Structures are given as structure tokens and as C-alpha cells.
């Protein structure tokens, strides 16, 4: 007889399966990514929605929104400071594909990344790991490792992954965290040389960057 509680076994299975699918997409050729990405997006969304949590519980409602709004000006201030320093040391450069469609699409993507991190992975890790700090650290590590082999982005996302998980535990709002991540990601893209982060690409796309 198994000593693993059925619910814990399910959580572990969903973490492994979800992360495996995401990493598989990241390392797939670009033409295959276009097919697999929406499939994985829908599957992970359905798994979360199957839990029948309310919008506030998912972090998509009004709960914590006002109290967490300080995160956005903090992200803007950090962005401004980083751009000032980058300009002084000569690494500041134009954004790759700076049109509205790409920027807005990127911001939507960072909101969904926070949805995956908090509502899919963090929620299950909290049930699997009795220590909240350990769950936050583990979630941040999984988030960062998904950005390999982009080492500079992996280091940055390790910090942000842990910080954003801790902030979500306090405020439980995805909107401020997703938008803050988008701002910081765009800042990273223009302040760190493309030669290091390859237009923020990860997985196979990073290795095939020219």
C-alpha cells in the first residue's frame, strides 16, 4: 500500500507533467513550438480551472490589488535607474521589435507566466512542501531553470521568481506582478547586451540565435 496521500501524489504528478511539457516546448524546434505552445497553454489552464477556485483565490480579482499597486512604481523606478546606469556604462540599446503588438503581447505573456508560476506550480508546491519558504524557493528555482541555457536570464529570473512568489503570498494579485515582470523584462532586454541574452530567448532558441 502506498504511503503517499492520493492528493499529494496528484499534485506531484501535475507538477512533473506540467513542467515537463513546458520544458519540452522550450526545447522544441520553432515550427513545433507553434503547435505545442497553445496546447500546453490550454492544458495547464484547464488543470487550474478544474480546481474551481474563485477569481480572488487565483489572484485575478480585486483582492490585494490596491495594496499591491506599489509594486508597479517600484518596478518603474528600478527600470529608470537601470536604464540610467546602462546608458552611463554604454550597454543601453534599442528594444528588439519595439512595436505596440510585440510589447503588448509580451506583457500578456508575463501575466500568464505569473499565472503558471503562482496558480499552477506554487499552489501545488505549497501542498507538497510543509515549509512555505522552501516552497517559495523551489518555485523560484523551477521558474529560473526554465530559462536555461540563458545564464544571465536564469540568474535574474531566480531572484524575481522567489520575490514574486513571496509577494503573491502576501497580496495574492497576478495583475501587478505580471505587469511588473513585463516592465522588468523589457528593462533587462534594453540594458543587458543582446550578445548575452539573445533577445531574451531560452532553450533551443537561445542556442540557435544568430
Predicted segment positions?
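Hydrophobic core segments of transmembrane alpha-helices in multi-pass, intramembrane catalytic enzymes
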Residues: 37-44, 105, 156-164
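Membrane-interface helix termini and inter-helical loops of multi-pass transporters
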Residues: 56-61, 86-98, 198-205
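Functionally important transmembrane alpha-helices
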Residues: 24, 154-209
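Aromatic-anchored segments of alpha-helical transmembrane domains
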Residues: 18-27, 77-86, 140-149, 182-193
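Short, aromatic-rich membrane-interface segments at the entry and exit
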Residues: 30-39, 93-97, 151-158
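N-terminal, membrane-interfacial amphipathic/helix-forming hydrophobic leader that caps
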Residues: 1-57, 189-210
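Interfacial transmembrane-helix boundary/kink motif in multi-pass membrane proteins
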Residues: 2-18, 38, 52-80, 97-98, ...
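Function-critical hydrophobic alpha-helical transmembrane segments in multi-pass membrane proteins
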Residues: 84, 88, 92-145
